[in-house]
Swiss-Prot record:
Small subunit of the glutamine-dependent carbamoyl phosphate synthetase (CPSase). CPSase catalyzes the formation of carbamoyl phosphate from the ammonia moiety of glutamine, carbonate, and phosphate donated by ATP, constituting the first step of 2 biosynthetic pathways, one leading to arginine and/or urea and the other to pyrimidine nucleotides. The small subunit (glutamine amidotransferase) binds and cleaves glutamine to supply the large subunit with the substrate ammonia. The keyword Amino-acid biosynthesis applies. Residues 172-358 form the Glutamine amidotransferase type-1 domain. Keywords: Amino-acid biosynthesis, Arginine biosynthesis, ATP-binding, Glutamine amidotransferase, Ligase, Nucleotide-binding, Pyrimidine biosynthesis. One of its GO terms (cellular component) is cytoplasm. It comes from Fusobacterium nucleatum subsp. nucleatum (strain ATCC 25586 / DSM 15643 / BCRC 10681 / CIP 101130 / JCM 8532 / KCTC 2640 / LMG 13131 / VPI 4355). One of its GO terms (molecular function) is ATP binding. Its EC number is 6.3.5.5. Belongs to the CarA family. This is Carbamoyl phosphate synthase small chain. The gene is carA. It catalyses: hydrogencarbonate + L-glutamine + 2 ATP + H2O = carbamoyl phosphate + L-glutamate + 2 ADP + phosphate + 2 H(+). L-glutamine binds at residues 46, 220, 222, 248, 251, 289, 291-292. The lineage of its organism: Bacteria, Fusobacteriati, Fusobacteriota, Fusobacteriia, Fusobacteriales. HAMAP family: CPSase_S_chain.
Length: 358
């Protein structure tokens, strides 16, 4: 018998079975089309405040291990799947997905038609939703959802609270934590970088005081226009140091240079998004997770030029500065999870640092 339901703000109800924590949560309902990588999705801070629908029909079949987390504490509001595996099989598996969600206090629902839900989100756009007990009155929950205002301080919720010690030797890279994935740190350290992680609200003066050879701006959740402190910091360093922005970092650099952003109807979330480098003609398959994009037309009045576009919807996927060693991409070159087609961009960042140090 059904014991949990997903109720959307428009009154649509999906009845299913509970797994994970026995709690009720409200969030923005989104979908991800990746076939694997549910542990990385679960722990990606960019999903802060969201209820994530996984379109692949069977989730959890290789369990949860200690190595594949992208943050210390997952912050999604819920997980929606067609079928959840209760008996995972993998030599690294330490617990089931159900057990992991219970440990982190995250509710889940399975047994619903995730294809129907995804088609609805694709055609109507993402909406607020709530995972609740089957006993809850639908009209009451819908009324609560309509009154609910989703938080605007999402980057603050997931960013580091203080400056971290260095994690390596070599080129000094200040990593501005907007909701970073551990995979980004891993890529930098593997290239011999001395990585210093700083909070999102670190000032330009504080960043420059660390004497960085380069600055990287990470991924993160929410509306980029809410991150005003980060935008001001970027304005203060953009002509003084080599910069590489990823995802949220890409959007903030664009805003700092005078471009505009807008909310996508249903976002880009998955591990199979084709992106074209319009400078070289190269097409890469990328991992993506974002609900906002940079307005291409707004680049005309800035010192930025378009470098990458999405094949599927022709939206902006990358820019570079015309005067300074600054470039950004909307997708995730560190993958985790996803294809590694664009990991070479970390090498481009290192090359820019070296050229700027000469």
């Amino acid at each position: 018998m059904y014991n949990r339901q997903l109720i959307l703000e428009d009154g649509t109800v999906y009845k299913g079975y509970a797994f994970g924590a026995d709690v009720e949560n409200v969030g923005e309902v989104v979908f991800n089309t990746s076939m694997t990588g549910y542990q990385e999705i679960l722990s990606d801070p960019s999903y802060n405040g969201q209820i994530v629908t996984l379109t692949y029909p069977l989730i959890g079949n290789y369990g949860i291990n200690r190595d594949d987390f992208e943050s210390m504490k997952p912050c999604i509001k819920g997980m929606v799947v067609k079928e959840v595996c209760a008996t995972p099989s993998n030599f690294r598996s330490e617990k089931t997905l159900d057990e992991a969600l219970k440990d982190f206090g995250i509710p889940g629902i399975y047994g619903i038609d995730t294809r129907a839900l995804t088609r609805k989100l694709r055609s109507k756009g993402v909406v607020k939703g709530c995972l609740v007990s089957i006993d809850r009155n639908v009209d009451e929950v819908v009324a609560e959802l309509k009154k609910t205002v989703l938080p605007t301080n999402q980057i603050e919720q997931v960013s580091s609270k203080s400056i971290s010690p260095a994690l390596g030797r070599g080129r000094r890279v200040v990593l501005v934590d907007l909701g970073m994935k551990i995979g980004i740190v891993r890529e930098l350290v593997s290239r011999g970088c001395d990585v210093i992680v700083v909070p999102y609200n670190t000032t330009a003066e504080e960043v420059l005081r660390l004497e960085p050879d380069g600055v990287m701006l990470t991924n993160g959740p929410g509306d980029p226009e809410d991150a005003k402190e980060s935008i001001e910091m970027i304005k203060g360093i953009i002509n003084k140091v080599t910069i590489f922005g990823i995802c949220m970092g890409h959007q903030l650099v664009s805003l700092a240079c005078g471009a505009k952003t807008y909310k996508l109807k249903f976002g880009h979330r998955g591990g199979n998004h084709p992106v074209k480098n319009i400078l070289t003609g190269r097409v890469d398959i990328t991992s993506q997770n974002h609900g906002y994009a940079v307005d291409i037309d707004s680049l005309n009045d800035t010192d930025l030029e378009l470098t990458h576009i999405a094949i599927n919807d022709r939206s902006c996927e990358g820019v570079r500065h015309k005067k300074y060693p600054v470039f950004t991409v909307q997708f995730h070159p560190e993958a985790a999870a996803g294809p590694h087609d664009t990991s070479y961009l970390f090498d481009e960042f290192i090359k820019n640092i070296d050229n700027n140090m000469k």
